[in-house]
């Protein structure tokens, strides 16, 4: 049965084009009319709109391009991340109000990037924050409390961060923390004296890039994943004993000849180490393999003899020093299941043959050179 109420209207292309043109002209007229209002009125109107729509007005015309930046009130219910790139002329009061806003709105992520600017974070940041990710970049903290308690924090990145106070040891009591990144190799501002950390963070994944990583290793006994980069071969402080009984995965940057000594020390105190990765982390890292082998340990570390399953070596150049280090690991890692070497050398076939010879007594081991 046919539908008696059905109707179909067809417009030709000329009609549609004319209709669209009229619509565009009307919109442009409205924009011109609104743009004739003084800035004070326009800012009042913008302050009543959601922040997303306020920012979108920047494409209307040259005048609107920067007008939205003068809006003082932000209206939103779904923002979870705040990134602040702060001009050195900003005052502590300005910064604290923004951080307090992030805490009050229960934001999940906060990033503060500054250049040689000293400021004091509000107490609410340290005690009442719901933040899960905090990134501080090129920041000098004034009067940080010795004890930091962030109940929801999962990821903490301290990039060229220092303190202007006499506090030399910071306690990070964050049981929920899963990723900690400390990098003090960039920027002109550096800490004076020996700054250290006491860290209470079960199941932690740690990335340390510092001029002397020994400062940070002692309190990281509960860590399961550790990533290390040392930019100097000079170590002035070494704790007597490390304890990495939970360490499962170790990444080590090869930009310092000291790294082999560091590796052998960690292997001695990481009996459950299962994955070992050797590589260069950053563009500024330059491989230093002089005296890479150093003094081989008298006793084969337990982690090598029984637990190590995966070896991955990137930027492998097959130098004499690297070859000796690889032979030592392959010859003693009786539980090794997979060894992978990444190289730009054209002698990959010969390298693979040598690798297999070193580990030929281990029936379950597979080796490849890429």
Curated annotation (Swiss-Prot):
SUPFAM superfamilies: F-box domain, RNI-like. Residues 31-77 form the F-box domain. Residues 292-343 form the FBD domain. Pfam families: F-box, FBD. InterPro entries: F-box-like_dom_sf, F-box_AtFBL13-like, F-box_dom, FBD, FBL13/AtMIF1-like, LRR_dom_sf. This is Putative FBD-associated F-box protein At1g50980. It comes from Arabidopsis thaliana.
